[in-house]
Amino acid sequence: MPREDRATWKSNYFLKIIQLLDDFPKCFIVGADNVGSKQMQTIRLSLRGKAVVLMGKNTMMRKAIRGHLENNPALERLLPHIRGNVGFVFTKEDLTEVRDLLLANKVPAAARAGAIAPCEVTVPAQNTGLGPEKTSFFQALGITTKISRGTIEILSDVQLIKPGDKVGASEATLLNMLNMLNISPFSYGLIIQQVYDNGSVYSPEVLDITEDALHKRFLKGVRNIASVCLQIGYPTLASIPHTIINGYKRVLAVTVETDYTFPLAEKVKAYLADPTAFAVAAPVAAATEQKSAAPAAKEEAPKEDSEESDEDMGFGLFD
């Protein structure tokens, strides 16, 4: 009987993961190290209506995906990433929005000896409030301290742990003592390892790329292409406008140095022959605009006078 129950559970699990893979075009492969059942329940509640979390044994997930490759060959790209303590977060919503919800559900945690540090830990310079008997912990970690008013004071900021480092016993003990100072260096939650989007698998860092960043990179690429094409004389859509402008400038330069001319070059020649004429023409044009604006102002002034005369027809406030 237990075997039948286990077999039924496996069968239902296979059907569930296949159904989710068919229904949801996008999903995250997430790491679940140090995530407890209570925190997982909180994450599921926060994602309700937007995403579905599915955990399970790696062998079962791989077997279910391999059995479904005939219907969706693109799922094979997921197989190399199913290793370690991982699960799936399926969604139809915006991936960035779901990612932000997962990040919001991280919880601070104390350091444990033997754990892998998920982030850098720096102990700031401060008075720890700890008694002199705890000095040995700081000495073992190479942290410079002094005794100030009967308590240990850290003299300078110290980088205690780097990302990926294994937390030692001394580091864990010190950090747990510093928890009394509201220093909770680690936070745990579902960590996005890979993103699956309609058959494509990519790193979660891609989600940080905004439209503005893409636009800037595109423009930079266009400028680089135009520059290279101009240098080698190869015409492209990016370089042709610059080629035409540069050619026009060269033609103008030739007309200036020779007797050859054309209508568009006449103005350039006139400017070079007498630059002061153009300097005088600009103030004259500005003065003409001011004169044309003055009559309009004069026409508005009599209207205001007539309105004032109408108001003063002879009746006082108390007549």
Curated annotation (Swiss-Prot):
GO molecular function annotation: large ribosomal subunit rRNA binding; structural constituent of ribosome
Q: What cellular component terms from Gene Ontology apply here?
A: cytosolic large ribosomal subunit; nucleus
Q: Which GO terms describe its biological process?
A: chordate embryonic development; cytoplasmic translation; ribosome biogenesis
Name it.
Answer: Large ribosomal subunit protein uL10
Functional description taken from the UniProt entry: Ribosomal protein P0 is the functional equivalent of E.coli protein L10.
Record keywords, A-Z: Cytoplasm, Nucleus, Phosphoprotein, Ribonucleoprotein, Ribosomal protein
Family, according to the entry, reads as follows: Belongs to the universal ribosomal protein uL10 family.
Please name the Pfam families in this protein's record.
Answer: Ribosomal_60s (PF00428), Ribosomal_L10 (PF00466), RL10P_insert (PF17777)
Cell compartment(s), UniProt:
Nucleus; Cytoplasm
Predominant place of localization: nucleus
Decide whether keyword Protease is in the record: no
Q: How is it modified after translation?
A: Phosphorylated.
Residues covered by region (Disordered): 289-319
Q: How does it assemble?
A: P0 forms a pentameric complex by interaction with dimers of P1 and P2.
